[in-house]
Amino acid sequence: MAKEKFSRNKPHVNIGTIGHVDHGKTTLTAAISAVLAVKYGGEMKDYDQIDNAPEERERGITIATSHIEYETAKRHYAHVDCPGHADYVKNMITGAAQMDGAILVIASTDGPMAQTREHILLSKQVGVPYIVVFMNKEDQLDPQDKEEMLELVEMEIRELLSTYDFPGDDTPIIAGSAFQALEEAKAGAVGPWGEKIVALMDAVDEYIPTPERDIDQAFLMPVEDVFSISGRGTVVTGRIEKGTIKVGEEIEIVGFGDTRKTTVTGVEMFRKEMDQGQAGDNCGILLRGIKKEDVERGQVLVKPGTITPHTKFRCEVYILSKEEGGRHTPFFSGYRPQFYVRTTDVTGSCTLPEGTEMVMPGDNVEMTVELVAPIALDKGTKFAIREGGRTVGAGVVAEIIA
């Protein structure tokens, strides 16, 4: 059976839901999908389909990132539902890197919570450029002091966004109930609650600009996952960071071990074949003569000769203060945290510049890092620094040394 062709008739934008566990991120994702399907046509994805990663079943919390697609009148969106639980922030770092903008979900019954802060901070660190806010669970507020509560929560949110250098005063904030909107849409209507979801997506359409894609640069795609398809070969999935890729083009697989060359035999997006994949697309790339065990998450697919694996670099980093959830104590030369780059984490040891004895939480510092394994790096590559399951800093590669 021939696959349906992917049509590119609207601008494409990657967004996602972030926020505290149980504030309604997945319900909102389902509500957006359902309301837009009723209003503009398209496939409705229900809550279970979105909340469908295998690990979650046991604990009732979202761990893996779930990708769905939907359309407004103006745009085609790929939406990633980000993990909410603190233990799975690692996944948020890899998931949030896939966003041109985010919808921050906050329960108006609770206001901002610990993970709300952590996700805003992470968004800043991993370079999510725009945030739109949805104040959820409006239907659960006492009608008598509802307006006052919403105003209070809104004020808190704006202050919090400004604290992390997002434009708190200008951020669109829409109140509603994802659950009620979803119920209306399931009954085939866009009712008063559904209209609030439409208003939210209008704000997303207007406020989150269509990103300038890095189409003209050399092809680069971080590997997120690798599958074996019987009779067809090995498929690598990820989001193309730069450039374009067509069937028949040669690429290199870079990182960890030896660099390998191969040829692209297929490009697909949402199970539809494409003539070419381009920057910003989440897609699957079929590779000739490559076994599943030859590729792993954390490597990158690149245009031959454009990027090489490195272990040593100079970087500019910001170390979080204790108040921001960072370390409580300083660190010294020889400190060995994990460096999260694109889709991978690698241990590295830090060397402080001469004359700098230690780095205090809240400091900005330039240091040299040597990784235990080579990964694809270039100047400007961003990373997070983590230790013992929490983010302690963020940085950017200033210069490659080796």
From Swiss-Prot:
One cellular component term (GO) for this entry is: cytosol
Stretches for region G5? 177-179
Task: Provide the residue positions that the database annotates as binding GTP.
Answer: 19-26, 81-85, 136-139
Localization, per the record, is:
Cytoplasm
- Which residues does the annotated region (G4) include? 136-139
Q: Which residues form a coiled coil?
A: none
The catalytic activity, as recorded, is: GTP + H2O = GDP + phosphate + H(+)
Query: The organism sits in which domain of life?
Result: Bacteria
Q: Which UniProt keywords apply?
A: Cytoplasm, Elongation factor, GTP-binding, Hydrolase, Magnesium, Metal-binding, Nucleotide-binding, Protein biosynthesis
Give the residue ranges for region: G1: 19-26
A GO term for molecular function: GTP binding
Return the InterPro entries for the record: EF-Tu_GTP-bd, EF-Tu_GTPase, EFTu-like_2, EFTU_2, G_TR_CS, P-loop_NTPase, Small_GTP-bd, T_Tr_GTP-bd_dom
Which Pfam families did the record assign? GTP_EFTU, GTP_EFTU_D2, GTP_EFTU_D3
G3, as annotated region: 81-84
Location of the tr-type G domain: 10-212
The positions annotated for binding Mg(2+) are T26
Q: Which CDD domains match?
A: EF_Tu, EFTU_II, EFTU_III
Q: How does it assemble?
A: Monomer.
- Which NCBIfam families did the record assign? EF-Tu, PRK00049.1, PRK12735.1, PRK12736.1, small_GTP
PANTHER family, alphabetized: ELONGATION FACTOR TU, MITOCHONDRIAL (PTHR43721:SF22), ELONGATION FACTOR TU-RELATED (PTHR43721)
The job of this chain, per UniProt, is described as: GTP hydrolase that promotes the GTP-dependent binding of aminoacyl-tRNA to the A-site of ribosomes during protein biosynthesis.
Q: Which family does it belong to?
A: Belongs to the TRAFAC class translation factor GTPase superfamily. Classic translation factor GTPase family. EF-Tu/EF-1A subfamily.
Official protein name in the record:
Elongation factor Tu
- Native organism is Aliarcobacter butzleri (strain RM4018)
Lineage summary: Bacteria, Pseudomonadati, Campylobacterota, Epsilonproteobacteria, Campylobacterales
The gene name on file is: tuf
